[in-house]
Curated annotation (Swiss-Prot):
Database matches in InterPro entries: DNA-dir_RNA_pol_insert, DNA-dir_RNA_pol_RpoA/D/Rpb3, DNA-dir_RpoA, RBP11-like, RNAP_asu_C, RNApol_insert_sf
Nucleotidyltransferase among keywords: yes
Subunit organization: In plastids the minimal PEP RNA polymerase catalytic core is composed of four subunits: alpha, beta, beta', and beta''. When a (nuclear-encoded) sigma factor is associated with the core the holoenzyme is formed, which can initiate transcription.
GO molecular function: DNA binding; DNA-directed RNA polymerase activity; protein dimerization activity
Family the entry assigns: Belongs to the RNA polymerase alpha chain family.
Recorded superkingdom: Eukaryota
Organism: Vitis vinifera
Region (Alpha N-terminal domain (alpha-NTD)): 1-233
UniProt-recorded name of the protein: DNA-directed RNA polymerase subunit alpha
Stretch list, region Alpha C-terminal domain (alpha-CTD): 265-331
Places the protein is found: Plastid, Chloroplast
Length: 331
């Protein structure tokens, strides 16, 4: 556990992590402060941050399981201690960390007797198992257990439907939220009209990301939600803004596509996903909303095409070109 003495600045707004600990692989805790704030601001920020932490951060879960010769979810399998339902509930609890987009496949193939744990899950490289010791099943006899899995990254909840059983597979209720809990409290200090506030924010996560990472992601998501309001104001000043705005050379993306193909002949561009480019969240979200999922999708767009994307700015195009040049050395 890490603790720091709380110090309050009376001049510059600042935040600090004052306590951080890892209780176990699936429970991390962090306590943060933001100060100094004017009276009322701490509650405004605290409420918004708590809602963003609990509802706006994506997580990764197992959402479907498939195995042969299972008549229904509540059946039992000879040689396995747990029922099918209990195995599905254990799979629901597996904590995963990933940067994938959409769904991916994984599988379990184990032979008894012995315990089947999370370390027996064979997953894509983009998916990391947080706690390999999580229990799935116990095989009492020398039998094989093979289960196909579907892994998905999303936010909030996913509740299985009665008509959602397909091809002998079983949907699993998923809780995508990596933040287990978040609380905020306020400490006031000062006298009279000069009273100020310190916001204390406590975050518990499931280990798929740290409380600090959760705080950063929630903050970015809140900023993204407010960008349309800023964009609307910018449009009213569009003509004045354009007089001072720098521009890029026109339509450079097709040239870069040709050079990238020349420099990286061995790479299939359609198999390079933009998830791998470490894009800023705002740019990444804009591209995803426009169905740009791979490097090939991106490089087939002109600068004019990109500028038509909602909330996409000339500065974003510049930053995107810089990232491409960094990753692929485009001259």
């Amino acid at each position: 556990m890490v603790r720091e003495k709380v110090t309050v600045s009376t001049r510059t707004l600042q935040w600090k992590c004052v306590e951080s600990r890892v209780d176990n692989k699936r429970l991390c805790y962090g306590r943060f402060i933001l100060s100094p704030l004017i009276k009322g601001q701490a509650d405004t920020i605290g409420i918004a941050m708590r809602r963003a932490l609990l509802g706006e951060i994506e997580g990764t879960c197992i959402t479907r399981a498939k195995s042969e010769k299972i008549p229904h979810e509540y059946s039992t399998i000879v040689g396995i201690q747990e029922s099918v339902h209990e195995i599905l509930m254990n799979l629901k609890e597996i904590v995963l960390r990933s940067n994938l987009y959409g769904t991916r496949g994984a599988f379990i193939c184990a032979r008894g007797p012995g315990y089947v744990t999370a370390q027996d899950i064979i997953s894509p490289p983009s998916v990391e198992i947080v706690d390999n010791t999580q229990h799935i099943a116990r095989l009492m006899e020398p039998i094989d257990l093979c289960i196909g899995l579907q892994i998905e990254r999303n936010r909030g909840y996913s509740i299985k439907r009665p008509n959602n059983f397909q091809d002998g597979s079983y949907p699993i209720d998923a809780v995508f939220m990596p933040v287990r809990n978040a609380n905020h409290s306020i400490h006031s200090y000062g006298n009279g009209n000069e009273r100020q506030e310190i916001l204390f924010l406590e975050i518990w996560t499931n280990g798929s990301l740290t409380p600090k990472e959760a705080l950063h992601e929630a903050s970015r998501n809140l900023i993204d939600l407010f960008i349309p309001f800023l964009h609307a104001e910018e449009e009213t000043l569009h003509l004045e803004y354009n007089q001072h705005k720098s521009t890029l050379p026109p339509l450079t993306f097709h040239d870069r596509l040709a050079k990238l193909r020349k420099n990286k002949k061995e790479i299939e561009l359609k198999y390079i996903f933009i998830d791998q480019l470490e894009l800023p969240p705002r740019i990444y979200n804009c591209l995803k909303r426009s169905n740009i999922h791979t490097l090939l999708d991106l490089l087939n767009k002109s600068q004019k095409d990109l500028m038509k994307i909602e909330d996409f700015r000339i500065e974003d195009v510049k930053q995107l070109l810089g990232i491409l040049e960094k990753h692929f050395t485009i001259d």
